[in-house]
Amino acid sequence: MAHKKGTGSTRNGRDSNSKRLGVKAYGGEKVSAGSIIIRQRGTSFLPGINVGKGKDDTLFALKEGTVSFDSIKRNLRNRKRVNVVL
């Protein structure tokens, strides 16, 4: 028989690293071509004028300019859109 009480195991004890998602350049900020505007999972924000979308749904500036946000009605709901105005 054991003289010590055996310790149980736990299924906790691990956590993933943060992915640093969110808006990186806010409305009114100047951005250069290729700079990241928003990192996101899925399309919370849609790309607008002079904005491209990467394979991980990251929005980035295609041209140098100023970031602006607006809202468009699409498929019975309002969607947020990001533009880069020259």
Swiss-Prot record:
This is Large ribosomal subunit protein bL27. GO terms for biological process: translation. Residues 1-24 are annotated as: Disordered. The keyword Ribosomal protein applies. Keywords: Ribonucleoprotein, Ribosomal protein. One of its GO terms (cellular component) is cytosolic large ribosomal subunit. The lineage of its organism: Bacteria, Bacillati, Cyanobacteriota, Cyanophyceae, Synechococcales. It holds the Pfam family Ribosomal_L27. One of its GO terms (molecular function) is structural constituent of ribosome. Belongs to the bacterial ribosomal protein bL27 family. InterPro entries: Ribosomal_bL27 (IPR001684), Ribosomal_bL27_CS (IPR018261). It comes from the Bacteria. PROSITE patterns: RIBOSOMAL_L27 (PS00831).
